[in-house]
Amino acid sequence: IRGFGIKDVNDLVCWNKYLLETYGKDHKILMYGKEQGANTILNASGRHVLKNVEAIISDGAYTSPYDIIGYRLEADYKISKYPAISIIARHIKKAVRIDLKENTTKYVRHNDIPTLYFHAKDDDFVPLKMVYPLYNKNRGEKVLFVLKDEKYLYELVENDDFKQTLSQFIKKYMK
C-alpha cells in the first residue's frame, strides 16, 4: 500500500463491497488495521463509505502522513524535518497527487463506528502521542488502551487487562 492511508480508502471500499457481494449483505464486519492500515480504515470511517462495519480496531495509527514522515526523518536520519518534509510533500503531491497534510483527525470527527484505539507506550515507529488527537476527536463510541510495550501484545494471559478490553469490545459490538 503506497497511498499513505489516503488513496487506499478506495481499495478498502472495494474490498468491503466484495466481501458483502461474495458472502452476503447480512454479514457483520470488524476491521483491524495497523499503522497505515489503521489510518486507511479511520479515513474511510469518517467518509461513511463502509457498509456493515460494526467496529474498528486501530493499532498504532498516526495523525497524518506529514507528521509521521517528519517524525521518521528526525528519528531515523537525525535530520531536521524542515525543510526536508516540505520538499518531500511537494514531490509526492506532484508525483502521486497525495497531500501529506491530509489529517486523519479530520475524518474521525465524523466517525460513528465504535473504535478501539490501542497503541504501545514504547512504539518505536509511531509515537504514542499521535493516538491522542485521533481518540479525542473521534465522534463515535471509542476506547483507548495503551499497551505497556509491543511485546506485551503477543504474551496475553487469561487475566490480562488488554485481553479483557479487547474481548469486551468485540462482544459489545459484534453481537
Residue map of PLM features:
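Alpha/beta-hydrolase active-site loop
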Residues: 2-23
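Alpha/beta-hydrolase fold nucleophile elbow
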Residues: 23-35
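Glycine-rich nucleophile elbow surrounding the catalytic serine of serine-hydrolase chemistry
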Residues: 33-43
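Hydrolase active-site cap/lid region
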Residues: 43-97
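Short beta-strand/loop motif that positions the catalytic acidic residue
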Residues: 110-112, 117-119, 123
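Short alpha-helix in the alpha/beta-hydrolase fold that links the catalytic acid
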Residues: 113, 127-136
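Acidic catalytic loop of the alpha/beta-hydrolase fold
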Residues: 122-126, 152-153
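Catalytic histidine-centered segment of alpha/beta-hydrolase-like enzymes
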Residues: 150-163
